[in-house]
Amino acid sequence: MKFFKTLLFIILFPMFSAGQEKAYLPGEKVNYSINYGVVQGGIATLEIVADTFKGKEVWHSVLLGKTTGMADAIFKVKDIYESYIEPESELPVLSIRNIREGRYTKYNEVIFDHYSRSDSAILTSDLTGVHITQKGIHDILSCFYYLRNHHLQDYDGLKKGDMITIMTWFTDELYPIRLRYLGTFEIKTKVGRMKCLKFNPVTEVGRLFKTEDDVTFWFTADKNFLPVRIRFEIFVGAFVAEIVGYEGLKYPLELKKKDTNQ
């Protein structure tokens, strides 16, 4: 089962835009419920805190996803992803993947060196050694925060159908991400109604997905740009991850009184 791994794939792409206010600060934490139909099958939390790495101040993000209830009894999943991010550049300096899915386990650390080479970055994995990649490369979580700061703040410039293609480092390899913009919609969640930006991350057809459009993602169209709902259409049915709680947001969450479209 690669549910939480897939969840990570879809919230990324880096695009530089200097001088904008950050959409988040350390102390932000978001809680999600993961449901299969009316049955809750798991929970997830995403938070970022102030920390240090090699004596320097960093922002430490942690994404935890795990099964609950009957799903946990049938197939236990506990996936933890961590990113240590430079506040100024918003680039990762350390990425950690620690997953348990049934009997399968994997632990991987990658150190990012963005400065030793002028034309590329050096990535050192504890599993596969040294890799030379393009400058400005992100890991999964740092890309998520970079997305909120440097692309979604300018969403008025996006047109329906616009496609963004980026390259990220995940599971010890370069992985292309394609994100298609679908427009703005108002949706109802467990914390209230809100205007959202809707995206289809183009997924890889195969073991999980039947088509390239089987994942849909909603970000709040306010100053926070929080991911509040993710819908997965996979071979066995539809899973939905939805926000159920939050704290430490930089800006008040903008809630609506009426639905318009979903």
Language model segments and positions:
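Histidine- and/or cysteine-centered catalytic micro-motif in compact active-site loops
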Residues: F3-F4, E204
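Acidic, serine/threonine-rich low-complexity disordered tracts
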Residues: Q20-H114, Q153-Q262
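Sec-dependent N-terminal signal peptides
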Residues: F4-M15
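Hydrophobic, well-structured mid-protein blocks that either form specific transmembrane helices
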Residues: N108-Q153
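Generic alpha-helical structural signal
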Residues: F13-P14, E21, I132
